[in-house]
Amino acid sequence: MTAVRTIGIMTGNSLDGVDIVLTGFENGRITDLDGFSKPYPRSLTEKMLRLRARIREEGGRMERLVEDGFSLEAINEYTSLVAETVNTFLQRSGYCREDIAALGFHGQTCDHFPPSIAGGKPAYTVQVGNAGLLADLTGIPVIYDFRSDDIMAGGEGAPLAPVHNLHIAGDLRNKGVFPVAFCNAGNTGNISVITEDKDGENVVRGWDVGAFNH
């Protein structure tokens, strides 16, 4: 199998910076190769806080904000910072953009209203970010919107970390470390537990456990 390299991009609810990781996939193994972080300028943090508050006031209805110049300005400024982070990383690390198959772009969560708290009302999730602009500014294909399908299927849309932890667990299992549990300590802490079913296949469960890095 030809090695595939991708860059994952995360901006957490703390609104303090952009974190990226370069990950390699080869022969069924996943390896984190390098990473880079860039802090938010204070002005952008303030804009994103205002944007998040407005989206929550509208109950996630983005159509009410599409003609709002401030909202589009904030989203594009945020996306430009993400692109700058990727481009700076590539320049400093020596990796060519042609070596990167795709960017995984989570976007900035501004509201999250899953079934567990919706109380029978329509569930939704809102992550902002201009994927087309990011692709244009970096020259790399962008994969985005990771939570919506799960919400529409009745899931919680969170956490995302168990998917990555499942890959790591496969490598640990080969080394005799299994079953395994992971604690992911972000703005909201979450736990992943990887066990096996009766057929010996890996089974992953994950859930948020509460506020952590506030």
Report each predicted region and the residues it spans.
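Short acidic/glycine-rich loops and adjacent helix/strand connectors
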Residues: 1-214
